């Protein structure tokens, strides 16, 4: 691994205010916001954090009744954040394009510091997650002949990029999609990373990212906007991948697959909604929710069949740990909803 020089400095939050929420009906709360949001992280039923375009991040502590909106300032950059992760005491947000900037934010004070910076002109970061309070991972498109993967083992204070000699090689034109902050899925000490473009593969890392293997998938691939957009695990053995062709969202062939052997093999799911940017298991169940700009979809039994439950489209969403609340986001909007209301829409 190559050690990356990290620049630290402390900054203060600006432009903190509360957004008014439109309550459509009991159980559904929506808010308009002046940014595009592709990164969400749910702490519990009532608390959700977001990161988006125009240097913005924020949160709700009251089930989406009110939202706090904050702005990070770094030089004169107009930053777009498409990755967010939350630990016990900190929030981490990562900008998408070069220079890739990763900030650690104190939950109580909302002061923040830069903990990782990558200036390679090819830098493009897609997703970030933490296993626990100490170990975290972020993934980006290749800057050499492998995916860009950076790790932290000290609670996010420092990050190291894994050298390509320790990673599976990437095919030219293979990358990842920064569509929903869900092309990483963590379970136990493993990481599942989804790719797309010229090839659609799943990289599986063990022992907090120490060793890696790449597995081929049957998801549609070969063009710039085809491949896997989202991955989520039910267990170490069982995971689902979803994506498709962003330029032909109505296509349903080869857009969703499941593994029951830890990623070694993947079986296509024929009855699926077509293009999906985010798919998530409802915790402790075999039920799934999926979303894209075409709508929201629901499956009761390991994706065997799907029902469209809303025509309203969202880039991404998250489910609270006990499965009671969901938070959705898209272009200029945030929505919170309890699971009973969602399934009865």
Model-assigned labels for residue ranges:
Residues 47-50, 90-92, 134-138, 190-192, ...:
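Entry beta-strands of beta-propeller and related beta-repeat scaffolds
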Residues 31-32, 75-79, 120-125, 168-178, ...:
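Short glycine-/Asp-/Thr-/Trp-enriched loop segments that recur within the blades
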């Amino acid at each position: 691994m190559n050690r990356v020089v990290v620049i630290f400095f402390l900054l203060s939050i600006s432009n903190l205010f509360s957004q008014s929420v439109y309550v459509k009906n009991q159980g559904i709360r929506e808010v308009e916001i002046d940014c595009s949001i592709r990164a969400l992280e749910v702490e519990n039923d009532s608390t959700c954090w977001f990161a988006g375009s125009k240097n913005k991040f924020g949160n709700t502590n009251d089930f989406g009744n009110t939202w706090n909106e904050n702005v990070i300032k770094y030089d004169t950059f107009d930053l777009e954040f498409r990755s967010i992760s939350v630990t016990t005491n900190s929030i981490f947000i990562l900008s998408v394009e070069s220079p890739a900037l990763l900030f650690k934010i104190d939950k109580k004070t909302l002061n923040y510091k830069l903990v990782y910076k990558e200036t390679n002109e090819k830098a493009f970061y897609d997703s970030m997650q933490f296993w626990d309070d100490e170990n975290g991972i972020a993934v980006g498109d290749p800057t050499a002949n492998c995916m860009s993967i950076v790790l932290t083992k000290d609670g996010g204070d420092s990050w190291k990029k894994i050298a390509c000699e320790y990673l599976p090689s990437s095919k030219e034109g293979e990358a990842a999609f920064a569509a929903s902050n869900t092309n990483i899925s963590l379970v136990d000490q493993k990481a599942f990373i989804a790719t797309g473009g010229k090839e659609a593969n799943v990289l599986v890392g063990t022992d907090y990212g120490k060793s890696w293997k790449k597995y081929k998938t049957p998801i549609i691939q070969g063009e710039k906007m085809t491949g896997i957009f989202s991955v989520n695990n039910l267990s170490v053995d069982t995971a689902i991948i979803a994506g498709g062709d962003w330029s032909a969202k109505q296509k349903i062939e080869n857009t969703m697959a499941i593994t029951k052997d830890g990623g070694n093999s993947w079986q296509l799911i024929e009855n699926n909604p077509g293009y999906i940017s985010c798919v998530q298991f409802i915790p402790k169940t075999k039920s799934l929710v999926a979303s894209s700009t075409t709508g929201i979809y629901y499956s009761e039994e390991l994706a065997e069949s799907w029902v469209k439950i809303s025509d309203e489209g969202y880039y991404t969403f998250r489910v609270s740990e006990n499965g009671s609340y969901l938070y959705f986001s898209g272009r200029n909007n945030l929505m919170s909803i309890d699971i009973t209301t969602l399934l009865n829409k």
